Amino acid sequence: MAKKSMIAKNKRPAKFSTQAYTRCEKCGRPHSVYRKFKLCRVCFRELAYKGQIPGVTKASW
């Protein structure tokens, strides 16, 4: 879980475009964030299993 200060810092606009990085909107994790959903892989998996992300289903082939 990210500190509140880091989450607040991420919400502010960066001075330079190269300083910007993605964080999970739910838990604040900085790595493995899917840009389309703004969620990390852990949170994405939780919400997908619960059926809270529309259009996402478990793959089967």
UniProtKB/Swiss-Prot annotation:
<keyword id="KW-0699">rRNA-binding</keyword>
<dbReference type="InterPro" id="IPR018271">
    <property type="entry name" value="Ribosomal_uS14_CS"/>
</dbReference>
<dbReference type="Pfam" id="PF00253">
    <property type="entry name" value="Ribosomal_S14"/>
</dbReference>
<dbReference type="GO" id="GO:0019843">
    <property type="term" value="F:rRNA binding"/>
</dbReference>
<feature type="binding site">
    <location>
        <position position="27"/>
    </location>
    <ligand>
        <name>Zn(2+)</name>
    </ligand>
</feature>
<dbReference type="GO" id="GO:0006412">
    <property type="term" value="P:translation"/>
</dbReference>
<dbReference type="InterPro" id="IPR023053">
    <property type="entry name" value="Ribosomal_uS14_bact"/>
</dbReference>
<comment type="similarity">
    <text>Belongs to the universal ribosomal protein uS14 family. Zinc-binding uS14 subfamily.</text>
</comment>
<dbReference type="GO" id="GO:0003735">
    <property type="term" value="F:structural constituent of ribosome"/>
</dbReference>
<feature type="binding site">
    <location>
        <position position="43"/>
    </location>
    <ligand>
        <name>Zn(2+)</name>
    </ligand>
</feature>
<keyword id="KW-0687">Ribonucleoprotein</keyword>
<dbReference type="InterPro" id="IPR001209">
    <property type="entry name" value="Ribosomal_uS14"/>
</dbReference>
<dbReference type="GO" id="GO:0015935">
    <property type="term" value="C:small ribosomal subunit"/>
</dbReference>
<dbReference type="GO" id="GO:0008270">
    <property type="term" value="F:zinc ion binding"/>
</dbReference>
<feature type="binding site">
    <location>
        <position position="24"/>
    </location>
    <ligand>
        <name>Zn(2+)</name>
    </ligand>
</feature>
<comment type="function">
    <text>Binds 16S rRNA, required for the assembly of 30S particles and may also be responsible for determining the conformation of the 16S rRNA at the A site.</text>
</comment>
<keyword id="KW-0694">RNA-binding</keyword>
<comment type="subunit">
    <text>Part of the 30S ribosomal subunit. Contacts proteins S3 and S10.</text>
</comment>
<keyword id="KW-0689">Ribosomal protein</keyword>
<keyword id="KW-0862">Zinc</keyword>
<protein>
    <recommendedName>
        <fullName>Small ribosomal subunit protein uS14</fullName>
    </recommendedName>
</protein>
<dbReference type="InterPro" id="IPR043140">
    <property type="entry name" value="Ribosomal_uS14_sf"/>
</dbReference>
<keyword id="KW-0479">Metal-binding</keyword>
<feature type="binding site">
    <location>
        <position position="40"/>
    </location>
    <ligand>
        <name>Zn(2+)</name>
    </ligand>
</feature>
